[in-house]
């Protein structure tokens, strides 16, 4: 159980409430399909659009994309790892219409996530963010300093520069700013997505995200989409 991951937090709350109410195992499982869990699964955008600073953050997709998705993520979060394939499928489905921006949000419950976040930013300074992103998620159960250095070497980073950058004040402050940006946007767990500046509520799957994207694209054409300037 990971208290910082968005989905597990909601699941745990449902289970705890069922146990407190003295419900049986069968009733508890049934509760997971009830209103609260169904609400979590219902894909929609919440709240008004917010401004999230993204200058200098790693991104993928065309700079003039109609839709910007900002992802707050943690390299040791199991749900973030699962979401990678779904987000990649979304980017393939909309190759000219979506830009994805990655923001660090290492959770306190993940002891190696903060170092991994610094490593990702250090790799970004050498134009190697996405290779390190993929490598660290693939090895998320061991993101010790030794493991991260090995992954960096395998991905062709300049190791002298990487080792200096990972411990630099500049990189550490970037991690802190990303976390603060997430907190200001009311990020409570990972992964958390903002689509056009609005917080996304729902499963991070292609099936759940596609209707949201289609709706945003339709809104962009008619000028009714809620804009945040991200």
Spans of model-derived segments:
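Short N-proximal segments of mature Sec-exported proteins
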Residues: 1-14
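Short, charged, surface-exposed loops that flank catalytic or proteolytic processing sites
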Residues: 17-28
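C-terminal cap of thioredoxin/glutaredoxin-like
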Residues: 18, 38, 68-73, 79-91, ...
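Loop/turn elements at helix/coil->beta-strand transitions in domains of secreted/extracellular proteins
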Residues: 25, 65-68, 95-99, 126-131, ...
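All-alpha RGS (Regulator of G-protein Signaling) helical domain and cognate RGS-like helical scaffolds
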Residues: 37-54
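A short beta-strand-turn-helix
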Residues: 51-67, 92
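Conserved helix-turn-beta segment immediately C-terminal to the redox Cys motif
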Residues: 84-105
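Short, internal strand/loop/helix patches
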Residues: 120-142, 151, 156-163, 170
């Amino acid at each position: 159980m990971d208290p910082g991951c968005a989905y597990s937090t909601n699941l745990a709350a449902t289970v705890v409430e069922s146990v407190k109410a003295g419900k049986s195992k069968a009733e508890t499982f049934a509760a997971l399909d009830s209103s609260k869990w169904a609400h979590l699964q219902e894909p929609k955008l919440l709240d008004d659009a917010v401004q999230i600073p993204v200058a200098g953050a790693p991104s993928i997709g065309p700079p003039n994309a109609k839709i910007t998705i900002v992802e707050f993520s943690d390299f040791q979060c199991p749900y973030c790892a699962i979401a990678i394939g779904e987000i990649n499928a979304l980017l393939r489905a909309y190759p000219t219409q979506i830009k994805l921006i990655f923001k660090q949000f290492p959770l306190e419950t993940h002891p190696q996530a903060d170092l991994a976040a610094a490593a990702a930013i250090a790799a970004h300074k050498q134009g190697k963010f996405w290779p390190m992103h993929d490598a660290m998620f693939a090895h998320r159960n061991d993101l010790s300093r030794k493991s991260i250095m090995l992954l960096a070497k395998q991905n062709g980073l300049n190791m002298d520069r990487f080792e200096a950058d990972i411990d630099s004040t500049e990189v550490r402050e970037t991690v802190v700013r990303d976390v603060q940006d997430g907190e200001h946007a009311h990020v409570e767990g990972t992964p958390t997505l903002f689509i056009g500046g609005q917080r996304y509520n729902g499963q991070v799957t292609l099936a759940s995200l596609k209707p949201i994207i289609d709706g945003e694209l339709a809104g962009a054409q008619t000028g009714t989409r809620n804009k945040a300037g991200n």
